[in-house]
């Protein structure tokens, strides 16, 4: 089955310096869900709840923290209150936040808390319900924290590099989460795979075709937009705040912002069960 990513031209259609993103959808709140306390997952709030995005992949080096920071930065840019819950013992999101503060680049509109285990995660989610958006950066291994993070999510975002090893790990993760969801008596959270560190040279190559065909065969939804391999993203995660605290005089920063905007719009649409109008050919 053909997939947009196979012929995607996101990089080639990046706007010029005058580009200004149309505001993200005005209401990111997910409709009320009433969930019973099952398997230690209390989720029975009435009223408005924050939208929860869980970034998960047990394989190290998949780019979870980059995706988490991009998500948080895009929502914060549109004036939503955001908190990143760093549930990874490596603390990469925490290091980014602390390094940014040390440089005087406090990530505007983004707070950060750490959650060392499943209990701390549960307490954090309940305590932070006044925020608009919660982004959970999960550990690089499959365990209780990742499971609980996924069961709570409006959307599970699974970063994946264009390689069959990475794709097979993503599929195993999804199947395990489906099993745990069934065991807990909870509906499976929506999820999307996003190709990370994507290179325009990957387009129309055999590895990309094989990975996309494999994920299609497994009925795994893949984002039409990918996060490109960019020095700008590496600079950002090294403690330079968000993309919107970097100089827009730099064309590479403008391109990264446009790329991030397109990705987050698609992920946001996925939480609502909709597909945005294609912007690439």
Please tell me what each predicted stretch does:
Residues 2-54:
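Extreme N-terminal, non-catalytic leader segments
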Residues 45-48, 52-62, 69-136, 140-144, ...:
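P-loop/Walker-type NTP enzyme "switch/lid" segment
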Residues 95-96, 143-149, 167-170:
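Conserved ATPase-coupling elements of RecA-like P-loop NTPase cores
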Residues 145-164:
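Inter-motif core of Ras-like GTPase G domains
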Residues 161, 191-206, 226-236:
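G-domain G4 guanine-recognition motif of GTPases
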Residues 170-185:
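Conserved C-terminal guanine-recognition region of P-loop GTPase G domains, centered on the G4
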Residues 211-244:
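Beta-strand-loop-alpha "switch" segments that mediate conformational coupling across diverse proteins
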Residues 235-257, 261:
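Inter-lobe coupling/hinge region of RecA-like P-loop helicase motors
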């Amino acid at each position: 089955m053909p997939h947009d990513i196979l012929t995607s031209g996101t990089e080639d259609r990046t706007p010029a310096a005058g580009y200004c993103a149309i505001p993200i959808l005005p209401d990111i709140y997910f409709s009320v869900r009433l969930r019973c306390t099952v398997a230690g997952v209390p989720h029975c709030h009435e009223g408005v709840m924050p939208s929860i995005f869980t970034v998960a992949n047990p394989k190290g080096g998949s780019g979870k923290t980059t995706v988490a920071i991009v998500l948080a930065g895009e929502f914060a840019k549109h004036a939503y209150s955001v908190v990143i819950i760093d549930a990874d013992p490596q603390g990469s999101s925490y290091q980014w936040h602390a390094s940014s503060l040390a440089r005087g680049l406090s990530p505007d509109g983004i707070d950060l808390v750490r959650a060392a285990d499943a209990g701390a995660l549960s307490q954090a989610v309940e305590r932070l319900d006044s925020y608009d958006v919660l982004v959970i950066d999960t550990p690089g291994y499959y365990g209780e924290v990742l499971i609980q993070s996924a069961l709570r999510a409006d959307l599970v975002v699974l970063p994946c590099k264009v390689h069959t090893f990475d794709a097979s790990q993503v599929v195993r993760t999804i199947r395990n989460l489906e099993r745990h969801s069934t065991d807990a008596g909870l509906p499976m959270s929506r999820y999307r795979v996003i190709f990370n560190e994507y290179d325009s040279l990957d387009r129309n190559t055999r590895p990309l075709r094989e990975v996309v065909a494999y994920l299609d065969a497994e009925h795994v939804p893949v984002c039409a937009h990918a996060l490109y391999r960019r020095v700008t993203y590496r600079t950002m995660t090294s403690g330079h705040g968000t993309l919107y605290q970097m100089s827009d005089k730099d064309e590479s920063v403008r391109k990264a912002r446009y790329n991030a905007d397109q990705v987050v719009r698609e992920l946001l649409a996925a939480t609502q069960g909709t597909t945005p109008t294609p912007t690439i050919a």
